[in-house]
């Protein structure tokens, strides 16, 4: 990190400038620039601070002997919570680590104990050896510990008796010997089978929570009598249940489906025709969440490509923040949202999986991926989006949002609409995806206040400043998406600083319009297009991205304007007049100095978010 000659950090004057000026400017462009600057300062400053948990994970990786380089963790990190695979975080603390069935052959480093907030540690089905770390007893937050099917040797350290919060302990199929702390036999789920640990008949304690101790001969007769009586009672109960079931079946509707998967979450969940998958089915479909199947990452978790036994391709969304207070709520919210939102331009949920440590959603796999991919990330030989398809995306997305806002009860706010969240089916029809950031609000409310979540460049200014989102927040994001469709560019692009001061696509478009350079707005990859249709979509986009939410149209109005029946000409004339006034006012305001050196602003543009990174 660069420093000035007097030892002052590069960020100090910039941070001071922001704090003195940004929050007293009532101007959309300057507000967005300030938030961008704050994001930049926060991200780059954090790289200078040591990350204890990140260092501990790197030590763990080294001790595991990751010869196949499965753990692509790097020392050039901000935090392991941002992008490291197999790591689950709550806030900025690691709470779960799942490294099962990974082919590791090393040892378990005591550095693992630096993960003070770890709740779940899964290392089963590897070839790890050596002694169990004594210091693991200090990890008092551990609830799930699975070290089964390895080659650990020695005894269970006495310090492990301090693990008072354990609910699931599996040390089976190891070379362990010696005694077992007495309190471990009171854990809800435990397994010491396949070891030489003292349990079973010799200790009169079971070796696993699912097994029973052998009964003595003095109790055999009583057991036989009890067993006979139980069988008779069971037969009577079974016959009674059959009668009740037949009577109930006549009355119930065919859509009332309950799910209860043994070994998973015991709660019964009814969600219509959704399929409940077992965790094993999901693991088989995704090759145990193999990183080679990773196709995306959002605010609530990673998305993997999967293949079901019937050869159906699916997209599996593994929620990353289940352990946080919002994790369970996020899962239930998404299930509820999809169950009430059914539209041809909305992504259909086909199933889910829930266990004590996992929340997973299963969607159809979209062969043509996302609009963002088709605009900017094509591989050699792949086909881009022609103008008719882009126009179809604009119309379909508008219809999908209109349905969420005006035809769902309660209404639904997406809150992260962008080209990357618009998927394309086999016929290149658009469907809105990623309802992990959606928010249900009561129809009697005009907005909902929550933490700011979304992608910088697509977030409406009032949402940035107040945290209040409404339908008009989505309208703003839709307008930016229209500009992405026309230009093929990102909502934020630092490379523009080489020629102008506008890093935001919205400001760049306004600049070109002032200079009457409409042709320069259109994506250079478009060889043919209708200039009148381009003009219409740009005008609608700018009406949708006005600074005041009250000035933005509702999505039903947007649909009408796109269809040519919404009075676009009159609204555009009014916008031009207001824009002229806004430009004059902007000239009287100070501007943010462009003091960022290109080499010091290497920030991943698609990853600049105001939500907690996962």
UniProtKB/Swiss-Prot annotation:
One of its GO terms (cellular component) is plasma membrane. It is found in: Cell membrane. The keyword Cytoplasm does not apply. The modification Phosphothreonine is found at residues 286, 312, 389, 449-450, 455, 466, 545. One of its GO terms (molecular function) is protein serine/threonine kinase activity. It catalyses: L-seryl-[protein] + ATP = O-phospho-L-seryl-[protein] + ADP + H(+); L-threonyl-[protein] + ATP = O-phospho-L-threonyl-[protein] + ADP + H(+). ATP binds at residues 295-303, 317. The active site is at residue 416. Glycans are attached at residues 65, 125, 146, 175. Pfam families: LRR_8, LRRNT_2, PK_Tyr_Ser-Thr. It is a single-pass type I membrane protein. Its main location: membrane. This is Probable LRR receptor-like serine/threonine-protein kinase At5g63710. It comes from Arabidopsis thaliana.
């Amino acid at each position: 990190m660069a420093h000035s000659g007097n030892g002052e950090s590069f960020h100090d004057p910039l941070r001071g400038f922001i704090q003195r000026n940004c929050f007293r400017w009532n101007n959309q462009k300057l507000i967005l620039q300030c938030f961008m600057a704050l994001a930049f300062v926060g991200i780059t400053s954090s790289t200078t601070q040591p990350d204890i948990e990140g260092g501990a994970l790197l030590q763990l990786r080294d001790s595991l002997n990751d010869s196949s380089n499965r753990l692509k963790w790097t020392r050039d990190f901000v935090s392991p919570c941002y992008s490291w695979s197999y790591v689950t975080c709550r806030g900025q603390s690691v709470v779960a680590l799942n490294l099962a069935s990974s082919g590791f052959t090393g040892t378990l480093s005591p550095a693992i104990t630096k993960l003070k907030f770890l709740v779940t540690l899964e290392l089963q089905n590897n070839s790890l050896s050596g002694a169990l770390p004594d210091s693991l007893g200090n990890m008092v937050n551990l609830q799930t510990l699975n070290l089964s099917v390895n080659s650990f040797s020695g005894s269970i350290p006495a310090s492990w008796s301090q693990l008072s919060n354990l609910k699931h302990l599996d040390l089976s199929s190891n070379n362990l010997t010696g005694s077992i702390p007495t309190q471990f036999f009171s854990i809800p789920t435990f397994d010491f089978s396949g070891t030489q640990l003292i349990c079973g008949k010799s200790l009169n304690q079971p070796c696993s929570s699912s097994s029973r101790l052998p009964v003595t001969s003095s109790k055999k007769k009583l057991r036989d009598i009890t067993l006979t009586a139980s069988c008779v009672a069971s037969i009577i109960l079974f016959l009674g249940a059959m009668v009740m079931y037949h009577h109930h079946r006549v009355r119930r509707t065919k859509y009332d489906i309950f799910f209860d998967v043994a070994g998973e979450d015991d709660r019964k969940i009814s969600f219509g025709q959704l399929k409940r998958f077992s965790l094993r089915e999901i693991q088989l479909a995704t090759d145990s969440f193999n990183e080679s199947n990773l196709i995306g990452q959002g605010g609530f978790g990673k998305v993997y490509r999967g293949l079901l036994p019937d050869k159906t391709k699916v997209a599996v969304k593994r929620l990353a923040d289940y352990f946080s207070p919002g994790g369970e709520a996020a899962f239930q919210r998404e299930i509820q949202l999809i169950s009430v939102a059914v539209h041809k331009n909305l992504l259909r949920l086909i199933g889910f999986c829930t266990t004590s440590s996992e929340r997973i959603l299963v969607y159809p796999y979209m062969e043509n991926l996302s609009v963002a991919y088709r605009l900017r990330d094509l591989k050699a030989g792949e086909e881009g989006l022609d103008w008719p398809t882009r126009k179809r995306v604009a119309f379909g997305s508008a219809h999908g949002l209109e349905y969420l806002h005006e035809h769902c009860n309660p209404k639904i706010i997406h809150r992260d609409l962008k080209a990357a969240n618009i998927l394309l089916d086999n016929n290149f029809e658009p469907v809105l995806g990623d309802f992990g950031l959606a928010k249900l609000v009561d129809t009697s409310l005009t907005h909902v206040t929550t933490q700011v979540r979304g992608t910088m460049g697509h977030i409406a200014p009032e949402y940035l400043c107040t945290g209040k989102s409404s339908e008009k927040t989505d309208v703003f994001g839709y307008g930016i998406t229209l500009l992405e469709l026309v230009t093929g560019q990102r909502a934020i692009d630092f490379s523009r600083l080489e020629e102008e001061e506008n890093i935001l696509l919205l400001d760049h478009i306004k600049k070109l319009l002032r200079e009457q350079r409409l042709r320069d707005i259109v994506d250079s990859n478009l060889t043919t297009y209708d200039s009148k249709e381009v003009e219409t979509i740009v005008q609608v986009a700018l009406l949708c991205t006005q600074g005041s939410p009250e000035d933005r149209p509702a999505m039903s109005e947007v649909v009408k304007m796109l269809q040519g029946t919404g009075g676009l000409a009159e609204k555009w004339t009014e916008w031009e007049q207001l824009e002229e006034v806004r430009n004059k006012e902007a000239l009287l305001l100070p501007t943010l100095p462009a003091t960022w050196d290109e080499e010091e602003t290497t920030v991943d543009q698609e990853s600049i978010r105001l939500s907690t990174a996962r």
